[in-house]
């Protein structure tokens, strides 16, 4: 979801695989790879050297985006950490985040908190997709500074676990993702019922997820006709 970048910042780069991929695929001219772990940065440097890309990769020991100037990176990637942490990283250096042409985020969890932060702080989601890795579906969000896009009339204003763009794009992993959300809440509901309680909030979420599944199925059906 990054392309044509002059300088990309890979935040929490770990061993540098994303940084190197951006360079190898021509998606970025240069990359600043940062992490709070010196050993991880050393491995990122070794990988770049092995691939002959060391002149285009700079590694920085840094907490979040603290090292970035306000106009330094035109693309930012923050992947493989919790949504709340991603939000805190963006909030700690809003000038750099706001001035970037795009920010690509892949939260491991906490998608609701991240979406709330983006909407509250006037970031516009410009693309979304789902990826399947090791049996788990992850949401990838691409955003930039700007007024949030208006929500479709059928989409609740207080929904942050999923985005309407995934419905509009007919993402093939959307229905499996919604089913996994619903089934997780069903398990929690069954556990609560064994204790003699039926939380209304859980039943409402399950009903909402079933509604989303029906909408997604109808969209796929209409596209096929």
Predicted regions and their residues:
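S-adenosyl-L-methionine
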Residues: 1-6, 20, 42-71
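Conserved SAM-binding loop of SAM-dependent methyltransferases across substrates and taxa
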Residues: 15-28
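Conserved SAM/SAH-binding beta-strand->alpha-helix loop
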Residues: 37-39
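Class I S-adenosyl-L-methionine
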Residues: 66-72, 84-225
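Short SAM/SAH-binding signature in class I
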Residues: 72-80
